[in-house]
A protein has these predicted regions:
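Single, functionally critical "micro-switch" positions that shape active/binding sites
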Residues: 54, 155, 233
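Conserved RNase H-like, two-metal-ion catalytic cores of nucleic-acid enzymes
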Residues: 39-117
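Acidic, Mg2+-coordinating catalytic module of metal-dependent nucleases/exonucleases
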Residues: 180-247
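N-terminal accessory regions of nucleic-acid-interacting proteins
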Residues: 1-50
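Active-site proximal loops enriched in glycine and acidic residues that flank catalytic Cys/His/Asp
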Residues: 56-58, 62, 81-85, 124-126, ...
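Conserved structured core elements
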Residues: 41, 50, 71-75, 98-109, ...
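Conserved DEDDh/DEDDy metal-dependent 3′-5′ exonuclease domain
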Residues: 92-204
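Hydrophobic alpha-helical membrane-insertion segments
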Residues: 64-66, 165, 243
Length: 247
């Protein structure tokens, strides 16, 4: 029988996905970057400027404290927005809810001011942002049209990696931002490690849920600053990934 991927004969019949996996494994040590330049360019052609790089942070409650929320529903409490102007200059906007309160209404009111109608918004694995926006549109019908407009104009930055139009064998067929970012923008890995208290989405979720119980004002301030720094880095990471795609 065949034990190693190297032993698979060249003439064996495989599905497209299997063939891709075999080729990737065979060339994994060669570090060959594969770019479908036409496909990447047609992705870049979807983008209009100014371009809104967008990321939500959410938390969940097993027993909901807020009106209209079900158990374990994703409740957005924070977002970061890097606005990428056509001349490569950036504007940063952000929102972080007040601890111990329902952050949704304030978040929605600022979001519809920060992201105008009919602009291109970029998110990584955009289905998550779209799910949260659609949930908010139901909960805040007065802003429904604007929120659904943002959702329908989201472009997924994961697309070129998911479709393997930009592929490194080290990705091993995976395309999450945790896989893509260190390969394309290695210096960002250190930036995340250098953050103070929050280094990933799980820590952000736990921190916001805990903040309402905290009494130490210095610690609250430190956690809030850490949350803002972490979320800002997430959208800056998207700016950097896009820059690599543009070549």
């Amino acid at each position: 029988g065949i034990v190693n991927v190297e032993d698979i004969p060249e003439d064996i019949k495989l599905s497209e996905q299997q063939q891709f996996a075999v080729d990737s494994a065979k060339h994994a040590n060669e570090g060959e970057l594969e770019i479908d330049k036409l496909a990447v360019q047609s992705f870049l052609d979807l983008l209009t400027y100014p371009l809104y790089h967008f990321d939500f942070e959410t938390f969940q409650q097993s027993i909901p404290e807020f009106k209209g929320v079900s158990s374990y529903q994703q409740i957005p409490f924070q977002y970061s927005l890097h606005i990428d102007h056509s001349d490569d200059s950036l504007t940063h906007k952000e929102f972080l809810g007040e601890e111990g309160t329902d952050p949704r209404q304030s978040l929605v009111e600022q979001l519809v001011r920060d992201i105008p109608l009919n602009v291109t918004t970029l998110a990584f694995n955009a289905s998550f942002e779209q799910m949260v926006l659609k949930g908010l549109a139901k909960q805040f019908p007065q802003h429904k049209d604007h929120l659904l407009n943002i959702s329908s104009n989201i472009v997924d930055l994961a697309m070129p990696f998911q479709k393997k139009h930009y592929y490194l064998p080290e990705m091993k067929g995976k395309y999450s931002i945790k896989i893509v970012l260190p390969l394309l923008v290695p210096e960002m890995e250190k930036a995340y490690k250098d953050l103070d208290l929050i280094h990933n989405g799980g820590e952000a979720m736990q921190a916001f849920a805990m903040l309402g119980e905290m009494t130490d004002k210095d610690l609250i301030r430190r956690y809030r600053e850490s949350l803002l720094s972490y979320c800002e880095l997430d959208t800056l990471a998207m700016v950097k990934i896009l820059k690599v795609l543009k070549g």
